[in-house]
């Protein structure tokens, strides 16, 4: 069975996710309209600017369709995508996670570090990254930085505060594809 992965493509860094998935031989659909959800099995919500993304979701009238899709299918949110999916936000509230926007600093504070993930070391790029300030009891913490979670999963939802698509390492995307 082939899997078709959608990448929400109305704002933010969607192209790098699409390129990473294509390098893995995955069929990619750039999601811009409500009917695009009918053609995909799972979805990536990329980084970008969460307030701008919310405004565009509302303007393009896809917020409700996005919420419905994300509640039933595997979804991966990176950076702003994690904010959109988190509880305590005015967004989708689909994962028991609270975040602090720009918790790791402003653009000038961006950094690259190595993280432990599934027994291996992966590179992680943090750009105006959210800090995960509270994780629910039913959350699986998959990677930490400075003893704080930065990659977590709850059921069908995977979120990272960093940008795995900006590295050569496809481990996190492969994990998502196997959820």
Curated annotation (Swiss-Prot):
Q: Could you tell me what reaction this enzyme catalyses? A: aldehydo-D-ribose 5-phosphate + D-glyceraldehyde 3-phosphate + L-glutamine = pyridoxal 5'-phosphate + L-glutamate + phosphate + 3 H2O + H(+); L-glutamine + H2O = L-glutamate + NH4(+)
According to its UniProt record, in which pathway does this protein act?
Cofactor biosynthesis; pyridoxal 5'-phosphate biosynthesis
User: What are the protein's UniProt keywords?
Assistant: Glutamine amidotransferase, Hydrolase, Lyase, Pyridoxal phosphate
**EC number(s) for this protein?**
4.3.3.6, 3.5.1.2
Q: Which GO terms describe its cellular component?
A: cytosol; glutaminase complex
Q: Detail which positions bind L-glutamine.
A: 48-50, 101, 127-128
Among InterPro entries, the record links this protein to: Class_I_gatase-like (IPR029062), PdxT/SNO (IPR002161), PdxT/SNO_CS (IPR021196)
Q: Name one GO molecular function term.
A: glutaminase activity
Q: Could you tell me the superkingdom of the organism this chain comes from?
A: Bacteria
Where along the chain is the active site annotated? 79, 163, 165
GO term, biological process aspect, one: pyridoxine metabolic process
The protein's role, per its UniProt record: Catalyzes the hydrolysis of glutamine to glutamate and ammonia as part of the biosynthesis of pyridoxal 5'-phosphate. The resulting ammonia molecule is channeled to the active site of PdxS.
By sequence similarity, the record places it as follows: Belongs to the glutaminase PdxT/SNO family.
* PANTHER family (alphabetical): PYRIDOXAL 5'-PHOSPHATE SYNTHASE SUBUNIT SNO, PYRIDOXAL 5'-PHOSPHATE SYNTHASE SUBUNIT SNO1-RELATED
Q: Which HAMAP family match?
A: PdxT
Subunit details for this protein?
In the presence of PdxS, forms a dodecamer of heterodimers. Only shows activity in the heterodimer.
Q: Which NCBIfam families match?
A: PLP_synth_Pdx2 (TIGR03800), PRK13526.1 (NF010050)
Indicate what this protein is called per its UniProt record. Pyridoxal 5'-phosphate synthase subunit PdxT
Query: Which organism does this record belong to?
Result: Francisella philomiragia subsp. philomiragia (strain ATCC 25017 / CCUG 19701 / FSC 153 / O#319-036)
Native organism taxonomy = Bacteria, Pseudomonadati, Pseudomonadota, Gammaproteobacteria, Thiotrichales
């Amino acid at each position: 069975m082939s899997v078709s992965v959608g990448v929400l493509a109305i704002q933010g860094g969607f192209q790098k996710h699409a390129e990473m998935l294509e390098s893995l031989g995955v069929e990619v659909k750039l999601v811009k309209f409500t009917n695009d959800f009918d053609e995909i099995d799972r979805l990536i919500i990329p980084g970008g600017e969460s307030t701008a993304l919310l405004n565009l979701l509302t303007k393009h009238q896809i917020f409700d369709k996005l919420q419905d899709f994300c509640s039933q299918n595997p979804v991966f949110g990176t950076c702003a995508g994690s904010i959109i999916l988190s509880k305590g936000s005015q967004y989708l509230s689909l994962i028991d996670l609270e975040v602090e926007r720009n918790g790791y600093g402003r653009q000038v504070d961006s950094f690259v570090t190595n993280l432990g993930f599934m027994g291996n070391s992966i590179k992680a790029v943090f750009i105006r990254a959210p800090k995960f300030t509270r994780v629910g009891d039913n959350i699986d913490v998959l990677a930490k930085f400075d003893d704080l979670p930065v990659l977590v999963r709850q059921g069908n939802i995977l979120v990272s505060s960093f940008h795995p698509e900006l590295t050569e390492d496809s481990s996190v995307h492969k994990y998502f594809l196997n959820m």
